Amino acid sequence: MAAGMKGKRSRRRKERKNVEHGCAHIKSTFNNSIVTITDSVGNTLSWASAGGLGFRGSRKSTPFAAQMAAETAAKTAMEHGLKSIEVYVKGPGSGREAAIRSLQAAGLEVTLIKDVTPIPHNGCRPPKRRRV
């Protein structure tokens, strides 16, 4: 190892992309919410999840956790110059509407909201019903 580089990791500085329009992909499951903001091609600008923000257990699946995840992802994406987004929502979770409202409140102009939840043509057998 070089004498001056001992104990230091070389880390590339994150480059600031200049993107005006992008896409927000919200995946809201029964257990978690993940918000990924990409440019129009599909390259990720920022992402955040409810679990990554410190929400654990049943608090991870709340609308408030999804709202915080969307806010965090939006702030990071707006540093890249993002102004307007198309929103693609996937999954049956409770954080869908909260995440969309949070993106609008963060100052992003929402141009499209589309539900892209995959629906099986009678594929896999669903999990058994819970008896509480």
Swiss-Prot record:
Any one cellular-component term (Gene Ontology): ribosome
Keywords on record: Ribonucleoprotein, Ribosomal protein, RNA-binding, rRNA-binding
Pfam families in the cross-refs: Ribosomal_S11 (PF00411)
Residue ranges of the TM segments: none
Stretches assigned to coiled coil: none
Sequence ranges of Basic residues compositional bias: 1-16
PROSITE patterns assigned to the protein according to its UniProt record, in alphabetical order: RIBOSOMAL_S11
GO molecular function: rRNA binding; structural constituent of ribosome
Source taxon at top rank: Bacteria
Renumbered residue ranges of the record's region Disordered: 1-20
InterPro entries xref list: Ribosomal_uS11, Ribosomal_uS11_bac-type, Ribosomal_uS11_CS, Ribosomal_uS11_sf
GO BP, sorted A to Z: translation
Cross-referenced SUPFAM superfamilies: Translational machinery components (SSF53137)
Record's function text: Located on the platform of the 30S subunit, it bridges several disparate RNA helices of the 16S rRNA. Forms part of the Shine-Dalgarno cleft in the 70S ribosome.
Subunit architecture: Part of the 30S ribosomal subunit. Interacts with proteins S7 and S18. Binds to IF-3.
Family: Belongs to the universal ribosomal protein uS11 family.
Name this polypeptide is given: Small ribosomal subunit protein uS11
Gene label: rpsK
